[in-house]
């Protein structure tokens, strides 16, 4: 029967209805929406920072509200306006858009706990006896501060503070008192202890000398020494950040909203547990808002192993970049963007999950995540293998772009079943592909059978004669057809072999209900290629 044309109509004519988006049409490809959750610099924190006077700080507070409805963000500069420049959210947006300039991004502020901000001190002593350069390595940026002969420690510290504060995307500010340069995180709490800043003296001949926790000579009179932080490997991190924030209110504000990827700045078990519970809840059969979460860490392998195995969730990814000078929340945002769009912006060849849900993501080039400064901090092959075995996504040195990193293999934190190693859902593409199939089938079946009636399977195998009526066997045929299409697209494998497992049955208890079991075997990526090269005589 023609849609909208009553069977009782008497007026002669030809009446054709154009049906858009109905049965038989593709649901189309929707853009993947990414949500960043992290601290913003709002009015209270900005007011505190703006009380500092050596030098005077002038930070403009972000305009967003903590734990509110997420804000659409069209650019990194927009994120700076909404969340405050140099906030976690601003820096995460910079990392995301650097990899995926056209990505669809939302940001949501997790309320700053108004605790203690992490800090670090570099103290200069003795006037400069010759000109040199003070080099500052700050979150992937390199700031060179010229020092003239005769410059006092106060002059040197002042110039360094000005250089750091002028780079307003940095997550910390600088103050000086005589020759003591103090860096303080813009956001409070223990995540500030994951920040690092390195200093070097560059002589007129170009010789570089790193400033350490021992008095370090510039070779031109001035000395420098680091204090107030924590040494780890070849880096010196901020310290004393305290009072953990909570994402509980932020999670509650998106309790019914789907974002394909949620990137958290947090790395503590409490906040991660709430994120994981949210992902599991919304993926349930009555909600069907399937999502994945991504976080980052620059901690030790032992620490991230405890964290990943403690979560053990297929919808959660933990990106690990030990002793990274780029904050881990920025690393997580850029890994997320690379997973979605691939690495062409970094000169790579890999496509992302928006193009192919089963894309092989091994070796994704990250455009802005720099490698560790010291070789000793770069993970060994045994450490990379251990990370993968424990549900951790490790980053490693890029062979194509010296000084930058790649994603070794994109894995989920799900690595255990009943405390026994189990890698059935090791790759994030398994989750992405299964979600793609479920989302697409949901759309296809919903449009195909909208307003249909359900009849029992016919004994002769023929379809029902009445309009808008189907049977379990006909539904099964449609699902089987779609599974074959996914196989042709390179998303699934062995569809024919698995078809005996595809069951579609009318409920014997609830009239009008059909229950299905739909087997999906996701195509694996080519991960390892081994062989022997044998010498012949």
Predicted segments, located by residue:
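Loop-centered beta-sheet repeat module
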Residues: 307-392
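Polar low-complexity, Ser/Thr/Gly/Ala/Asp/Asn-rich disordered segments used for subunit assembly
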Residues: 1-345, 498-499
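Structured, hydrophobic secondary-structure cores that serve as assembly/anchoring elements
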Residues: 1-104, 356-361, 365-537
